[in-house]
UniProtKB/Swiss-Prot annotation:
Domain (Integrase catalytic): residue spans on this chain: 111-285
UniProt-listed NCBIfam families: transpos_IS21 (NF033546)
Protein name: Transposase for insertion sequence element IS640
Role according to the record: Involved in the transposition of the insertion sequence.
Gene Ontology BP terms: DNA integration; DNA recombination; transposition
Gene from which this protein is expressed: istA
Length: 315
């Protein structure tokens, strides 16, 4: 950084008509520096250096805690304060800041699956107008891991039966089932997930057994493992539900969704593959074929005279 005297000399020489190259030679700096200083109305203030005298006795301890992946300055501040540190928090933050580039990255390595192997499931919600009234629309997104094709099912509730119906509809839409279905830790699918020991909802296991897929749950607080479907939830909110805000009914919502997926979403180019989901879907023809599945709450749609036959057939 140049001194105040250099700053005023640059201004004076330029005012007298000196060329920038001559000013740079006289001052002993680059032409780029001269141009930068000419733009300043006042001499740039020097950055004050933090004195680390009070912190110096604790630097070895701080470095040890950083090596143990403890980067919370408040935690470290409380620890060194108990050890006799009398300085402030800002001094500690100033010391830690340039070391943060050494912090291990939390970036998730993208895991690409084979065609017909994995489907990722997630829910989103948005407020729109249905039948003339503002209401919350829950929508389940089921995304094929390989092709990035997805199916969306809008429903008034985000419960177990609508979760299962969304998967049944997705399998029917894709023309078959996959080998694994990845879900988050919603109660409709997962009752408990403790250090990898997963207890699945019995209803979800019945669905998995019927379609012969392997249920899988994300690690708690690690939802990024199903990043493909989470990006689709955001994509829907920022695209479909921005363009379409009014619907006659939930049936109308789902009709519009399927039409929009066919016309727009399946034809978007995936930058990492230089292909569209529609093009990549040609490799997913080996997904397993499916048969129908009757949901518990669907029995309520039938009159009592046929419930007995449906009940026996369902089991």
């Amino acid at each position: 950084m140049l001194s105040r005297e250099d700053f005023y000399m640059i201004k004076q020489m330029r005012h007298e008509g000196a060329y920038i190259v001559d000013i740079a030679t006289q001052i002993g700096c680059s032409e780029r520096t001269v141009r930068r200083y000419l733009k300043y109305p006042e001499p740039p203030a020097r950055k004050t250096r933090h004195k680390m005298v009070k912190l110096k006795p604790f630097m070895d301890y701080i470095d040890m805690r950083l090596a143990e992946n403890v980067w919370n300055s408040e935690v470290i501040f409380a620890e060194i304060k108990a050890m006799g540190y009398t300085g402030g928090r800002s001094m500690l933050r100033y010391y830690i800041q340039p070391k943060r580039k050494m912090r291990p990255s939390k970036r998730t390595v993208r895991f690409e699956t084979q065609p017909g192997y994995q489907l990722q499931h997630d829910w989103g919600e948005v407020e729109v107008e249905v039948a003339g009234q503002r209401c919350k629309v829950n929508f389940a997104v089921n995304t094929l891991g390989f092709s990035r094709s997805f199916h969306v099912f809008a429903a008034p509730k985000h419960d177990a039966e609508h979760t299962y119906e969304s998967l049944v509809r997705a399998f029917r839409y894709f023309g078959g089932c996959v080998k694994t279905v990845l879900v988050d830790n919603q109660k409709a699918a997962v009752l408990k997930n403790n250090n990898g020991k997963v207890v699945f909802n019995s209803g979800f296991l019945l669905l998995a057994d019927h379609y012969n897929f392997l249920p899988r749950a994300c690690r708690p607080r690690r939802a990024r493992t199903k990043g493909k479907v989470e990006r689709m939830v955001k994509y829907l909110k920022e695209n479909f539900f921005v363009r379409y805000r009014r619907f006659d009914s939930f049936t109308h919502v789902n009709q519009q969704l399927e039409q929009w997926i066919a016309d727009v979403a399946d034809k978007r180019e995936l930058r990492q593959f230089k292909e569209t989901p529609e093009q990549r879907s040609r490799w997913s023809r080996n997904i397993c074929s499916v048969t129908g599945y009757r949901l518990r709450y669907q029995l309520l749609r039938y009159p009592p005279c046929v419930l007995g036959q449906l009940y026996r057939g369902w089991w």
